[in-house]
Amino acid sequence: MSQNQIIEGPAVRLFNHPNGPVPAPKWNLGLDLGERQDHSALVINDIEWQSLGRCYTTYAYKFAPILTVRSMERFPLSTGYQNIPLIIAERVRQINEHQSKRTPHVPAKIELVVDAGGPGTPVVEMLRAMAPENLTITPVMITSGTGESRLKGGYHGVPRRDLVTRLIQMIATGCLQCPASMPNALTWHNELLSLSRTNTHPGESGEHDDLTMAAALAAWAATREAPELSPAAATKKTKYGFIDKPIF
């Protein structure tokens, strides 16, 4: 790829890695905690970096991020909150085992983003008490506001509309991929259609949104790690000169 080529789609990241040409893999888990007759759901995605060679002027390694949904789970209504940390610990163990085979010399980073509203706060504390060493826990209070905020205790405030809108845009622009054959993919597709009809909130239709919110939380974590995955980056046309420095 030419250094002066106009880049469209997921943006190219010029990346200097201190331990070699392979960026660390990142796994993002989104956990939506259900109340009453709502299911809890867990969605897992991961970021892989597609190698685009090296910049011929700076010798920086060039990568494009690829975000793929790897797992979607809707837990039975009988699943107690006290069982959630055990489920998360098992998923982290599975991720570590899988990643050790895929990139044995590059350990994975894993982040769990939890919907901390309603019953979420005590679950967050249980998760923190049992978290494996390489798991970062990020509690999110989903708000009706208009902007993100940092709250006490490591919590973040994120508007619901922003989460859902970003997720839909990432799917539409190809920034987020999900195999159609994945279990619960069709259920998620139907949730998204329902949300599109009800202005990002299922309250009027009575439909569930647990898979969508879990996917939105995981996608939010991914865009924090790789801003190139955000829809704004996907539509931006930029000519790169120096490392991470646009010419104009």
Q: Can you describe what each PLM-predicted range is?
A:
Residues 133-157:
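RNase H-like polynucleotidyl transferase catalytic core
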Residues 1-141, 161, 165, 169, ...:
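RNase H-like, metal-dependent nuclease domains and their acidic two-metal-ion catalytic environment used
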